[in-house]
């Protein structure tokens, strides 16, 4: 039913939203809060009220028969109580039907109120002589429950309570004023009744207001907790997608656990890691096939591309290759420029790994052929495949990239280098694994690649089964069109590749706060497949917002079900059903130690109730010295308690507060923040009020007690004059019922301490109830009995002071107990939601930080911000062109000789452990402030690639002073020599003699992020290619730079030595320079010293 109502409301809200903005969603939220308020507060309380009233009716019948009262004398009572019981039972049955209750909520409230008022008047009119104090306690009960237990709103509750109290006052005033002999003390009694009713109205309104505020806070906390839970799930999904887009699942979870542990910090009792080595996330896998593929002709094409075109082409091409890899059970490892390599057989071994790689190679050639035929652009694929064993995983601390290492990987790389465009070049080992699945022909790879010749590798070309092999002169047959002839090759490529619709990198990322705002968004959909205009994005944002609202509302409905009336009495995971204690002792301790700034207002309300008790007793009691002294002492005590509670605020308002009064300021803070002072003050305050309610009853004069007759008025031993005298004395004791009413107000004063320990309030009220019953039924029973017998010939239950007092006190005790328990339950529930929200918020922050760490481990910080920003640009490809970026390649050529695969070093694993230490130590340098501008790009085997100048805004590059504009090139040189120093330190500890070979170049580059499956930040351009050549043609322990770079370095104070002219592959003859080692090191030391 709730679900149907919710859907109907959602439909109405959607229509309203279309007509008037966000009204619909607000209406949906309003209904949700109404449902929450109805089922969590109103429903349980009205059920409890009906149970209390029905229990009271049964108790009244039981007491009636227990006292042996004559049925003939109390027919009205015996008709009224069972009839009321039947009516309330029928209402109770209907209320328990949730759909009926929600539909007839106001009707039930009105019927119960009318029935209670009618019962009050029936008890008043048909019980004998009507007195001014008649049914005050019953009408006080009606007033109090109208506020606290009946589902009226505040306005309706005030109206109903005022009508109840004013009707009682008016009826009695009119009736008794016309009754002979009842006018003597009528005014003071009616005035006392008014004060009691005013007190009941104020206490009820106070209780209702605070409970509604508490419930609203609980609702908000529930919403916040559920929102945070949805966001946490979203963050976890996003983090998993992000992590799995960077690393394979088998290694990702292990690294994730370590990152989370690092983010959360060391926990108590957890042993610190005493291992001197960094963790190595590398595993060995056997029987895999490795594919290397290079796009032939792409370098020439790239020189004609704009930055956007280059990044778009690479993303589309490699996106297509990723799709082909997935179809053929291959895992892409890395993209190196325009080179793509992948492995089949990871992480789970596959018997057909060789077939998968060969099939993928053929599909890649076929895809490029289609591009070539459609665009007329002269590009092709050169593919090499080899099978064997690999070590795979991640090394270093930053910019993780999943990679593979082994001699077989090196051989696969040379299979590609020794191949032919448009063909799949395989080794004899791969051929054996194919088991005749493909026809092959001689490859003669040793002719084209010295490495293959040196290692005597027999190679073959796979014949594509889809068609006969074409001769090289027919491989390129451009399709000329009128439009194509007018367009650049890069434009033709870009337009054609758009039709592939490759996914964009990090398209699933959204802003970290998107789910905690009012207009929050949540994305659980797959990554988009292509460009969308702004309107489409806006539409999708609205649908995401709608999905988020629907999910939040669905979970709120579940939460409302979870805190329904019956649920708090059933077994709960967090709260014990009887005591309401938390199962978790730490949470229980935290709850009890919670600060309570509102405590002073509880004391204030209790003091107001005490003031009402004082006014009532002053109005009706004889004016005695004991009365004055007792209330005077009580007033002074309560005023002092009030002053201590409010001292903090009073002294803060006063500019001339004395230093001697500072202890009061501290005391006020201690009371608000510590439980034991609050408990002590609660006990003292309630004890004073409860005691003063009956204190003066013990000081009635002897004459007032002894002159009362001990039997009814018809006693034969009492003369008529004596009887008249007794009746007159009895009328002078009209104040006796007001002691009972004061006791009831005293019990109500206990309930105003809403967030004080429930068991403490229960104990105080129980002690008070027992004490009051001892007074009423034992110590002063003869006074009350005699007074009732003098006024009434056959007093019924509600006319007999002793019985009426005991029953009324018991009813109020049970009512206040239920309200106290209800209040305690929701206070604890609110605390629990806040506690869960706090923990989930911390977990969300950990997940957000984890996502940021993961993203910044792939991208530079400024690029990561681009993808984490609020804007919707993260659906577009990121690319940026720079005019001056310094690129460094630093390699350890000796590591190739050091790397061996044997049982001693666990088939090369221990060699990689050393490489991991080297790269990790290099990465440590990046955290130093002086190298904050250095951006690690990637590692390629034992080569470390980094760049500076990528953090500057391109438009601001030329705005800088010339010297400052090139400072980052000097930073790169300093970083290179810091790498040399790190490597020297590692050599000393590992007894090796590795030397670093460094190549540096500067100039324009294009930066971008490509690949949706494994997004990768990279830089491209001639500057990068030349820097790589500076390394590969360099000399050990030297930094080789181009002539242009050397001129810049010399202006920065570095000394460069000309090496001469060398031949650089693809670039011809270049004049290069070596940076002076000693000069650089001295500069580095001076910088560190400064």
Curated annotation (Swiss-Prot):
Q: Which reaction does it catalyse?
A: ATP = 3',5'-cyclic AMP + diphosphate
Q: Tell me where the transmembrane regions lie.
A: 45-65, 75-95, 107-127, 132-152, 157-177, 186-206, 601-621, 626-646, 679-699, 734-754, 763-783, 800-820
Presence of the UniProt keyword Transmembrane in the record: yes
Which residue stretches belong to region Interaction with GNAS?
904-921, 989-992
Q: Where does ATP bind?
A: 294-299, 336-338, 382, 938, 1018-1020, 1025-1029, 1065
Q: Which SMART domains match?
A: CYCc
Give the residues the record marks as binding Mg(2+) 2.
294-295, 338
Looking up Gene3D superfamilies in the UniProt record yields:
Nucleotide cyclase
Question: What EC designation does it have?
Answer: 4.6.1.1
| GO molecular function annotation | adenylate cyclase activity; adenylate cyclase binding; ATP binding; magnesium ion binding; manganese ion binding
Member of which family? Answer: Belongs to the adenylyl cyclase class-4/guanylyl cyclase family.
Q: How does it assemble?
A: Interacts with RAF1. Interacts with GNAS. Interacts with the G protein beta and gamma subunit complex.
Q: What is this protein called?
A: Adenylate cyclase type 2
């Amino acid at each position: 039913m709730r679900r149907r109502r919710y859907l109907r409301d959602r439909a109405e809200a959607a229509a309203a939203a279309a007509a008037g903005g966000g009204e619909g969603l607000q209406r949906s939220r309003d209904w949700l809060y109404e449902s929450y308020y109805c089922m969590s507060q109103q429903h349980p309380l009205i059920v409890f009220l009906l149970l209390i009233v029905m229990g009271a009716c049964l108790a009244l019948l039981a007491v009636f028969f227990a006292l042996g009262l004559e049925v003939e004398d109390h027919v009205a009572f015996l008709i009224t109580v069972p009839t009321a019981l039947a009516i309330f039972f029928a209402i109770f049955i209907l209320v328990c039907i949730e759909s009926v209750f929600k539909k007839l909520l106001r009707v039930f409230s009105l019927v119960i109120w009318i029935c209670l008022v009618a019962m009050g008047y029936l008890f008043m009119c048909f019980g004998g002589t009507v007195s001014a104090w008649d049914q005050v306690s019953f009408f006080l009960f009606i007033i109090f429950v109208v506020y606290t237990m009946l589902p009226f709103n505040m306005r309706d509750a005030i109206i109903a309570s005022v009508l109840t109290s004013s009707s009682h006052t008016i009826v009695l005033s009119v009736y008794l004023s016309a009754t002979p002999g009842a006018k003597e003390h009528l005014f003071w009694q009616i005035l006392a009744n008014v004060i009691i009713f005013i007190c009941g109205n104020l206490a009820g309104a106070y209780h209702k207001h605070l409970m509604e505020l508490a419930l609203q806070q609980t609702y908000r906390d529930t919403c916040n907790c559920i929102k945070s839970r949805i966001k946490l799930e979203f963050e976890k999904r996003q983090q998993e997608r992000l992590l799995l887009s960077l690393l394979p699942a088998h290694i990702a979870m292990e690294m994730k656990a370590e990152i989370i542990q690092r983010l959360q910090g060391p926990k108590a009792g957890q042993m610190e890691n005493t291992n001197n080595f960094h963790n190595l996330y590398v595993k060995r896998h056997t029987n895999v096939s490795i594919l290397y593929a290079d796009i032939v002709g792409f370098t020439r094409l790239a020189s004609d591309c704009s930055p956007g075109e280059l990044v778009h082409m690479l993303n589309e091409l490699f996106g297509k290759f990723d799709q082909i890899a997935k179809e053929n059970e291959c895992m892409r490892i890395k993209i190196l420029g325009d080179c793509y390599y992948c492995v089949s057989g990871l992480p789970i071994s596959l018997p057909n790994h060789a077939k998968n790689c060969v099939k993928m190679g053929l599909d890649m050639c076929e895809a490029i052929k289609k591009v070539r035929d459609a665009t007329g652009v002269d590009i092709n694929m050169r593919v090499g495949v080899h099978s064997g064993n690999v070590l795979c995983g991640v090394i270093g601390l930053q910019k993780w990239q999943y990679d593979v290492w082994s001699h077989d990987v090196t051989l696969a790389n040379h299979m590609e280098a020794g191949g032919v465009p448009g063909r799949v070049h395989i080794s004899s080992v791969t051929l054996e694994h194919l088991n005749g699945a493909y026809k092959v022909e001689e490859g003669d790879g040793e002719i084209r690649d010295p490495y293959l010749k040196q290692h005597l590798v027999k190679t073959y070309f796979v014949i594509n089964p889809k068609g006969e092999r074409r001769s090289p002169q027919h491989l390129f047959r451009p399709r000329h069109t009128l439009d194509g002839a007018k367009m650049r090759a890069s434009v033709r490529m870009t337009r054609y590749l758009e039709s592939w619709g490759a996914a964009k990198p990090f398209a699933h990322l959204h802003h970290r706060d998107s789910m905690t705002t009012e207009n929050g968004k949540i994305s659980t959909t797959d990554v988009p497949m292509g460009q969308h205009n702004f309107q489409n994005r806006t539409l999708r944002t609205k649908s995401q917002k709608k999905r988020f609202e629907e999910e939040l509302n669905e979970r709120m409905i579940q939460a409302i079900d979870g805190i329904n009336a019956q649920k708090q009495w059933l077994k709960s995971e967090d709260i014990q059903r009887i005591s309401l204690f938390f199962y978790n002792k730490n949470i229980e301790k935290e709850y009890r130690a919670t600060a309570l700034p509102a405590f002073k207002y509880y004391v204030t309300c209790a003091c107001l109730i005490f003031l009402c008790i004082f006014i009532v007793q002053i109005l009706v009691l004889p004016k005695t010295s004991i009365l004055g002294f007792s209330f005077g002492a009580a007033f002074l005590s309560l005023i002092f308690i009030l002053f201590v509670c409010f001292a903090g605020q009073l002294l803060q308002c006063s500019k001339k507060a004395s230093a001697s009064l500072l202890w009061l300021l501290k005391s006020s803070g201690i009371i608000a923040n510590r439980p034991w002072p609050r408990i002590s003050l609660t006990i003292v305050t309630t004890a004073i009020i409860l005691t003063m309610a009956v204190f003066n009853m013990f000081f009635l004069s002897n004459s007032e007690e002894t002159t009362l007759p001990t039997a009814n008025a018809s006693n034969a031993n009492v003369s008529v004059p004596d009887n008249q005298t007794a009746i007159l004395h009895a009328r002078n004791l009209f104040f006796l019922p007001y002691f009972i009413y004061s006791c009831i107000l005293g019990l109500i004063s206990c309930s105003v301490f809403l967030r004080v320990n429930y068991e403490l309030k229960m104990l105080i009220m129980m002690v008070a109830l027992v004490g009051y019953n001892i007074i009423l039924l034992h110590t002063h029973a003869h006074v009350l009995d005699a007074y009732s017998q003098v006024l009434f010939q056959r007093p019924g239950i509600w006319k007999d002071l002793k019985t009426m007092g005991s029953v009324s006190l018991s009813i109020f005790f049970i009512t206040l107990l239920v309200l106290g328990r209800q209040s305690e339950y929701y206070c604890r529930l609110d605390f629990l939601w806040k506690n869960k929200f706090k923990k989930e918020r911390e977990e969300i922050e950990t997940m957000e930080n984890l996502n940021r760490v993961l993203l910044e481990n792939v991208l530079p910080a400024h690029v990561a911000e681009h993808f984490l920003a609020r804007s919707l640009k993260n659906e577009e490809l990121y690319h940026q062109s720079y005019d001056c970026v310094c690129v460094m390649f630093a390699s350890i050529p000796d590591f190739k000789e050091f790397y061996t695969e044997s049982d001693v070093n666990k088939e090369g694993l221990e060699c990689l452990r050393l490489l991991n230490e080297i790269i990790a130590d290099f990465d440590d340098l990046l955290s130093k402030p002086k190298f904050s501008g250095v951006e690690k790009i990637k590692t390629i085997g034992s080569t470390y690639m980094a760049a500076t100048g990528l953090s500057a805004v391109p438009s601001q590059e030329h705005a800088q002073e010339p010297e400052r504009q090139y400072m980052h090139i000097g930073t790169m040189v300093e970083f290179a020599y810091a790498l040399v120093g790190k490597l020297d330190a590692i050599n000393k500890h590992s007894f090796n003699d590795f030397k670093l070979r460094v190549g540096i170049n500067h100039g324009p580059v294009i930066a971008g992020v490509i690949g949706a499956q494994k997004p990768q930040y990279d830089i491209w351009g001639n500057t990068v290619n030349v820097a790589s050549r500076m390394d590969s043609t360099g000399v050990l322990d030297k930094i080789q730079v181009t002539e242009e770079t050397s001129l810049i370095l010399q202006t920065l104070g570095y000394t460069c030595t000309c090496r001469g002219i060398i031949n650089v592959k693809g670039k011809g003859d270049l004049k290069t320079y070596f940076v002076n080692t000693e000069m650089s090191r001295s500069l580095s030391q001076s910088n560190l010293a400064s």
